A protein has these predicted regions:
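Surface-exposed cleft-lining segments at the edges of enzyme active sites
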Residues: 84-85, 145-157, 180-189
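Active-site-proximal beta-strand elements of phosphoester/diester hydrolases
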Residues: 44-56, 141-143, 166, 175-184
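His/acidic metal-ligating clusters that form di-metal
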Residues: 161-181, 189-208
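N-terminal, active-site-proximal structural segment of metallo-dependent hydrolase catalytic domains
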Residues: 1-106, 110-126, 192-195
Length: 208
């Protein structure tokens, strides 16, 4: 998507609102899933999880080195990752989720959260959430949260809003459900509760 197209879509936000503009952009309805590695031969007694804010990938090489070298990450099965760029100048215009997954030997799912509108040199200006797994990802979807803050009116002008990635992993033949959620930091306590619980409640309702 060209910068001109991103700006044209952004200009619709004040009139239509974020969600109606997001409906016009196919990437918001998609969840990328890339299974890059085989499942581990041994099944651990306990799955080890960690939440990690990648901070856009502005220090991507250092982040990858840390993930590969830190002893505490050696046996991590699942990483719930926030704030990963795809095609933004500030992080080298690369696909941060793919670069991390390839470098640390994990599968990943990625969902679009924001399209950045500030820098015309961004190849895509995409910014989103990811879930990294040592186990195959059999299914994943993106759930967009109720709006708690309109980022189009911020100095970091954007299309989009906070989202969660729901996924099903194949852990040696056993299905394990996981969720990577990025909460809105520009809201109050009740707003945070809404964004934290909605994805699970919505999925439970869909399963009924």
């Amino acid at each position: 998507m060209s910068y001109e197209n991103r700006i044209a879509l952004g200009n619709l936000v004040p009139t239509l609102g974020q969600f109606k503009v997001m409906d016009k952009i196919p990437q918001y309805q998609q969840c990328e899933v890339h299974n890059l590695v085989e499942a581990p031969a041994e099944v651990p007694e306990v799955l080890r999880h960690v939440v990690f804010n990648i901070e856009r990938g502005q220090t991507l090489h250092e982040t990858i080195d840390f993930l590969n070298m830190c002893p505490d990450f050696k046996n991590i099965d699942i990483i719930y990752a926030n704030e990963l760029d795809d095609g933004a100048v500030r992080s080298g215009n690369c696909n941060v989720a793919y670069e991390i997954a390839k470098s640390i030997g994990m599968n990943y799912a990625y969902g679009l959260e924001f399209i950045e509108l500030v820098n015309p040199d961004d190849n895509k200006g995409f910014h989103g959430n990811a879930l990294f797994s040592r186990w195959p990802i059999r299914w994943a979807k993106v759930v967009h949260m109720p709006e708690q803050y309109n980022w189009y009116n911020d100095r970091q002008k954007r299309i989009g809003g906070r989202c969660a990635i729901l996924a099903k992993l194949d852990v040696h033949g056993r299905e394990v459900g996981v969720a990577s959620i990025h909460l809105e930091n520009r809201t109050d306590g009740p707003g945070a509760v809404v964004t934290a619980t909605l994805p699970i409640r919505r999925e439970e309702k869909a399963q009924c």
